[in-house]
Amino acid sequence: SVIVRTIYYHDENNRLMKEISVGKYGNSIGSKTYEYDILDRKIKITTYDNNGLMEETIKFVYDNKNSKIYKNYMDSSQEIFLKKETLFNGEGNPYIEAIIDGKDRVLEKNVFFYDTLGRTSQVKQYDMFRHNEFDNVQLPIKVSIYEY
């Protein structure tokens, strides 16, 4: 069995700043660091491998109305290989999530639906790269329905 222990470090404002995961004999499996803006919004997550070398960086960009978040996923050479653009509804819940590759092609779109209590009721996943069009209607490749 694999035993992994993760140690979390927080600052004086209780924000997660760093996490380190260690394995069976206390050897590092990897770590992550977190950065925040002056509004306490997460703006950067950097992932390191077991040797302390940077593997991936995720940078967060927020619009002024907090209705949209962009996440840019960068490899160790700081090249963007994936982007996620998330639009939020009036209640602050994700409404549409677009997944975009490093060449700015939309690969996937996820549409979120909520019940009257604000709980996720359905998520429709669309493959935007390989269109499944029938009579000019985009068909979802996966529908997840949540029952409470």
Mark where each language-model region is:
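Buried hydrophobic residues that stabilize the cores of well-folded domains
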Residues: 1-148
